[in-house]
Curated annotation (Swiss-Prot):
This is TYRO protein tyrosine kinase-binding protein. The keyword Amino-acid biosynthesis does not apply. Adapter protein which non-covalently associates with activating receptors found on the surface of a variety of immune cells to mediate signaling and cell activation following ligand binding by the receptors. TYROBP is tyrosine-phosphorylated in the ITAM domain following ligand binding by the associated receptors which leads to activation of additional tyrosine kinases and subsequent cell activation. Also has an inhibitory role in some cells. Non-covalently associates with activating receptors of the CD300 family to mediate cell activation. Ca(2+) binds at D46. The modification Phosphotyrosine is found at Y86, Y97. Residues 71-108 are annotated as: Disordered. The record marks T50 as: Important for interaction with transmembrane receptors. The lineage of its organism: Eukaryota, Metazoa, Chordata, Craniata, Vertebrata. It is a single-pass type I membrane protein. Residues 84-108 have a biased composition (Polar residues).
Length: 108
């Protein structure tokens, strides 16, 4: 194991520990074992089925029009505009703030 990289060492350690637990589990029970080919087929089938479901949901989601966005746009177009409760700006009015225009010595 001197020529192995750290990742290879970790992989070999995990495979060894996993293999030992598999042997111990088989010796303790009378269960039928699953071959690695069957296990790989189950995992790949599950991945393919998951991908197929995700793609079907994506494409069906694109076919269905968006319910909320479409109704909000049409609803907003039918609402008549109301007058603004705010007063329009009239420009600068010096008479309103003329009494504040005094200069105090501590602001200089």
């Amino acid at each position: 194991m001197e020529g192995l990289r750290p990742s290879d060492r970790l992989l070999s350690l995990l495979l060894t520990v996993g293999g030992l637990s598999l042997v111990l589990a088989q010796s303790e029970c009378n269960c039928s074992s699953v071959s690695p080919g069957v296990l790989a087929g189950i995992v790949l089938g599950d991945l393919m089925l998951t991908l197929l479901i995700a793609l079907a949901v994506y494409y069906l989601g694109r076919l269905v029009p968006r319910g909320r966005g479409a109704t909000e746009v049409t609803r907003k177009q039918h609402i008549p505009e109301t007058e603004s409760p705010y007063q329009e700006l009239q420009g600068q009015r010096t008479d309103v703030y003329s009494d504040l225009n005094t200069q105090r010595p501590y602001y200089k």
